[in-house]
Swiss-Prot record:
InterPro entries: DUF167, YggU-like_sf. It comes from Mycobacterium marinum (strain ATCC BAA-535 / M). It comes from the Bacteria. The lineage of its organism: Bacteria, Bacillati, Actinomycetota, Actinomycetes, Mycobacteriales. This is UPF0235 protein MMAR_2910. SMART domains: DUF167. Belongs to the UPF0235 family.
Amino acid sequence: MTDIVVVRVKPGSRKGPLVETGSDAELTIYVRERAVDGKANEAAARLLAAHLQLPRSRVELVAGATSRLKRFRVER
C-alpha cells in the first residue's frame, strides 16, 4: 500500500529533531540540518520513517525538494 504524506519541514531548527502533529493533523518536521545539498531533505525523510516505524528505504521524496512543504511517498 502506498500513501502520500505531506509535511512541512523546518530546516536549521534548534527544536529538532522532532516530528510534531498540528491541530489540523499536519505534520511538521524540525531538523537541525541546514537546507544545503539536500541534507535537510534526507534528515526529514529519516525522521519521518522513524516516526512511522518504517525503514528509511520505504520513504521517498516525490515533490518539494526546494520547498518547505514536501510530499513523501510511503510504502507500508
